[in-house]
Design a protein with these regions (language model features):
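Alpha/beta enzyme core
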Residues: 1-92, 105-106, 110, 146-175
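C-terminal helical cap(s) of enzyme catalytic domains, especially alpha/beta-barrels
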Residues: 102-118
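P-loop/Walker A phosphate-binding loop and immediately adjacent motor/lid segment at beta-alpha junctions
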Residues: 46-57, 114-115, 122-125, 129-130
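Short acidic/histidine-rich active-site segments
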Residues: 93-98
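Flexible C-terminal active-site loop/helix
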Residues: 116-167
């Protein structure tokens, strides 16, 4: 290429070749497909397992796939079970948090424009309701470790720090 790279022929055969080359040295082998494709996933898994039985595989249930364009609702619902049976033990969605955060804040912005603080308060009430299920981010200062940094500051200053954040904070008083 003009940048000095070598061109390679991509595709499942090249992925299998690389997977087999790395298998002796890797804990698990990851194959990236262009679409959510069970046939390619099986071909890759079968080829790796033929030479390395039981080798764990990884599959990116990618946000770059238009899932509904390629699969029915039933196929989407069973996709992970099916690849799991092929040996794909590590299944993940790259950038799931990115997409989830962005659609959530976009929807909040739309509602905030129309409803003002009521829109945000509704989200906050949902956070409170979800604490019983293990949700912990209501107390955002705690979540980001503010108490830890307060302890470090107090340790360094022999308990005389004037820049701590938690003691007397709105979070400690209201939540």
């Amino acid at each position: 290429s003009p940048e000095g790279f070598y061109y390679v022929k991509d595709g499942i055969d090249q992925a299998i070749s690389r997977g087999l080359a790395y298998a002796p040295f890797a804990d698990l082998i990851w194959c990236e497909t262009a679409t959510p494709n069970l046939e390619e996933a099986k071909k890759f898994a079968d080829a790796i397992h033929a030479k390395f039985p039981g080798k764990m595989l990884a599959y990116n249930c990618s946000p770059s796939f238009n899932w509904k364009k390629h699969l029915s609702d039933d196929e989407i619902a069973t996709f992970q079970t099916k690849i799991g049976m092929m040996g794909y033990k590590f299944q993940f969605i790259t950038l799931a948090g990115f997409h989830t955060q962005n659609i959530a804040i976009f929807e909040l912005a739309e509602k905030y424009k129309k409803e003002g603080m009521t829109a945000y308060s509704r989200i906050q009430q949902n956070e409170f309701a979800r604490e019983k299920d293990g949700y912990t981010s209501v107390k955002h200062q705690r979540e980001v470790g503010t108490s830890y940094f307060d302890a470090v500051s107090n340790t360094i200053s022999s308990g005389k720090s004037s820049t701590t954040a938690m003691e007397g904070s709105t979070e400690s008083e209201q939540f």
